[in-house]
UniProtKB/Swiss-Prot annotation:
InterPro entries: Sporulation_SdpA (IPR023902). This is Sporulation-delaying protein SdpA. NCBIfam families: export_SdpA. Its main location: cytoplasm. The gene is sdpA. Disruption phenotype: When the sdpA-sdpB-sdpC operon is deleted, increased rate of spore formation; a double operon deletion (sdpA-sdpC plus skfA-skfH) makes spores even faster. A single deletion mutant does not have SDP activity (active peptide of sdpC). Induction: By Spo0A during nutrient starvation. Repressed by AbrB during regular growth when nutrients are plentiful, in association with the transcriptional repressor Abh. Required for the maturation of SdpC to SDP. Not required for SdpC signal peptide cleavage, secretion from the cell or disulfide bond formation. One of its GO terms (biological process) is bacteriocin biosynthetic process. GO terms for cellular component: cytoplasm. Keywords: Antibiotic biosynthesis, Bacteriocin biosynthesis, Cytoplasm. It is found in: Cytoplasm. The keyword Ribosomal protein does not apply.
Length: 158
């Protein structure tokens, strides 16, 4: 009982301890599990992914990051998300199948983003960012269904 009390009371002190400026969390919150965020995320929410031609190092699986326990490797996706938030939604291009998306990726001109102190973990180079709603589980049995709506954006960090 005493251990439970100590664990729960430590969350009180987590509110008054200093924050990590990058994660906007303090040390105790970084050690705690994800919480209810996993359970409250809508399954129909758009998925965002990014790809690059450059040698982007995603160090989550490396031994020096304790095979993903340290969160430093996730910072690159957070910084890329900050960039995407500041880009006008009109710049996203839409494609409906893999062939049209491949052609669109080659034709899109990248939006230039100047690297500054807000984006220290991202390497300079071109990034392709995709937004797509997940395919409904109703369509899983239909293998011939190849159409989808994907939005594509290309940025170049200089």
């Amino acid at each position: 009982m005493t251990i439970c009390f100590l664990l729960f009371s430590s969350y009180y002190f987590s509110n008054i301890s200093p924050q990590n400026p990058l994660f906007k969390k303090n040390f105790l919150q970084q050690l705690s599990p994800q919480g209810f965020g996993f359970y409250s995320k809508s399954p129909t929410e758009e998925n965002i992914s990014f790809h690059t031609k450059e040698n982007l190092k995603l160090p989550n699986a490396l031994p020096n990051n304790f095979f993903g326990i340290k969160r430093e490797g996730r910072v690159q996706a957070i910084e890329l998300g900050k960039i995407v938030e500041n880009i006008d939604p009109k710049n996203w291009k839409t494609c409906e199948n893999n062939n049209s998306c491949t052609n669109l990726e080659k034709q899109i001109k990248p939006i230039k983003v100047i690297k500054n102190e807000d984006y220290i973990h991202l390497s300079k180079g071109e990034y392709l960012i995709y937004r797509q709603k997940p395919l409904s589980w109703y369509w899983i049995d239909f293998k011939q269904t190849t159409s989808f709506e994907r939005k594509v954006l290309k940025i170049k960090i200089v």
